[in-house]
């Protein structure tokens, strides 16, 4: 009986492990102070989520080369109920600043916010690319 219960518990955990979190995917950022924006791929990293810049664009939407491609924009973001992610960091390339961050997911929109010393900066609403 105990073996059957243990096997059932393991199967439930294995089935749940295959489900992707809704925040996973590629997101288009809000334009920065220079009008540039990027595509950030969010995926699990340990027990949290990280986002890496995978493409960069100028204000007209033309893809541009950037030294920031491949750099983490988001890290240590922990999932909480109801589409809320917190306890992470976000790096703003245009200001070269790292902020304590939280995110709120609603469908294909991701509201990103960063705070430093009690002052918060709205990172804007990102749109799902895929």
Positions of PLM-derived features:
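Positively charged n-region of N-terminal signal peptides that target proteins for export
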Residues: 1-5
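N-terminal signal peptide c-region/cleavage motif recognized by signal peptidases
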Residues: 14-15
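Central antiparallel beta-sheet cores of small beta-barrel/beta-sandwich binding domains
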Residues: 23-24, 28-100
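Short, solvent-exposed mixed-charge patches
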Residues: 129-130
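Short, exposed beta-strand-loop hairpins at the edges of beta-sheets
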Residues: 94-95, 100-103, 109-123
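Sec-dependent N-terminal signal peptides
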Residues: 6-10
């Amino acid at each position: 009986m105990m073996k059957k219960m243990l096997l059932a518990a393991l199967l439930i955990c294995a089935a749940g492990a295959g489900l992707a979190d809704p925040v996973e995917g590629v997101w288009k950022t809000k334009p920065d102070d220079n009008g540039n924006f990027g595509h950030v791929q969010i995926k699990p990293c340990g027990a949290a989520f990280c986002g890496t810049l995978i493409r960069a664009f100028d204000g007209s939407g033309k893809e541009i080369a950037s030294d920031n491609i491949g750099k983490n924009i988001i890290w240590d973001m922990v999932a909480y109920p109801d589409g809320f992610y917190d306890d992470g960091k976000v790096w703003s390339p245009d200001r070269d600043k790292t902020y304590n961050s939280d995110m709120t997911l609603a469908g294909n929109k991701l509201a990103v916010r960063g705070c430093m010393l009690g002052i918060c900066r709205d990172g804007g609403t990102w749109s799902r690319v895929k």
